[in-house]
């Protein structure tokens, strides 16, 4: 049965307009994005099938072009649309972050870092550079690969801090495994960077580790 034949209150688009996007299931949201199904399969049914094949919404959103287009109902045009939507979301979060001091919008910081790093398949280390009023100057990825004491160079972090004329930093890196708990190496690296930046009177406000859930704050655990 086509979605057009469903009761109006159950159609994804009408339901979104009536109740808001948060009221929709993953399959219903995806169905609105897809717009149409395939022969013998409504957009919602196709969405459920795709979510099952990918193993969930996150895997679908993070799929590369070849993987994405290897599924029925998906192609290059949809992939391009999806990447544009995801990038608009990241830019929206970045604008929110730049408007105010990060101390006034701590959740915006977490949301932004999640959007930037959660999809990465390999470890990525980045810095959020802040001015004297703790407003964002820049976000920059500095290192990629295995993030440990041997691969992250304090002198490079100091160099980029001076280039941005930053007064404070937020450090961040992701754990592709999804487990955000810090390793001993993570804590040692944080201490080394804090010490190096203190020499130029720059504060490290926090170090967030991005996993599957909410970003883990080393400062909140007293590890900074």
UniProtKB/Swiss-Prot annotation:
Presence of keyword Metal-binding: yes
Pfam families the record matches: RadC, UPF0758_N
SUPFAM superfamilies named among the record's database cross-references: JAB1/MPN domain, RuvA domain 2-like
InterPro entries documented for this protein: MPN, RadC_JAB, RuvA_2-like, UPF0758, UPF0758_CS, UPF0758_N
Motif (JAMM motif): 173-186
PROSITE patterns on file: MPN, UPF0758
UniProt binding sites for Zn(2+): 173, 175, 186
MF annotations from Gene Ontology: metal ion binding; metallopeptidase activity
Any GO BP: proteolysis
Keywords per UniProt: Hydrolase, Metal-binding, Metalloprotease, Protease, Zinc
Location of the MPN domain: 102-224
Family listed: Belongs to the UPF0758 family.
PANTHER family per UniProt: DNA REPAIR PROTEIN RADC, UPF0758 PROTEIN YEES-RELATED
Protein name: UPF0758 protein PLES_57141
């Amino acid at each position: 049965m086509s979605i057009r034949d469903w009761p109006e209150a159950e159609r994804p688009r009408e339901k979104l307009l009536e109740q808001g996007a948060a009221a929709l299931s993953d399959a219903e949201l995806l169905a609105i994005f897809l717009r149409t199904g395939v022969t013998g399969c409504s957009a919602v049914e196709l969405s459920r099938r795709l979510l099952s094949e990918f193993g969930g919404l996150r895997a679908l959103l993070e799929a590369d072009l070849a993987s994405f287009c290897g599924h029925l109902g998906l192609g290059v045009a949809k992939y391009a649309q999806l990447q544009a939507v995801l990038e608009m979301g990241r830019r929206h979060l970045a604008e929110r972050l730049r408007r105010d001091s990060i101390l006034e919008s701590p959740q915006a910081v977490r949301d932004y870092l999640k959007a930037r790093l959660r999809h990465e398949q390999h470890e990525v280390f980045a810095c959020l550079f802040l001015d004297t009023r703790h407003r964002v100057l820049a976000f920059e990825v500095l290192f990629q690969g295995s993030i440990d004491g041997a691969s992250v160079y304090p002198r490079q972090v100091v160099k980029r801090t001076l280039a941005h004329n930053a007064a404070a930093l937020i450090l961040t890196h992701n754990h592709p495994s999804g487990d955000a708990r810090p390793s001993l190496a993570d804590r040692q690296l944080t201490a080394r960077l804090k010490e190096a930046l203190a020499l130029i009177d720059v504060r490290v406000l926090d170090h967030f580790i991005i996993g599957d859930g909410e970003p883990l704050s080393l400062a909140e655990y007293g590890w900074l």
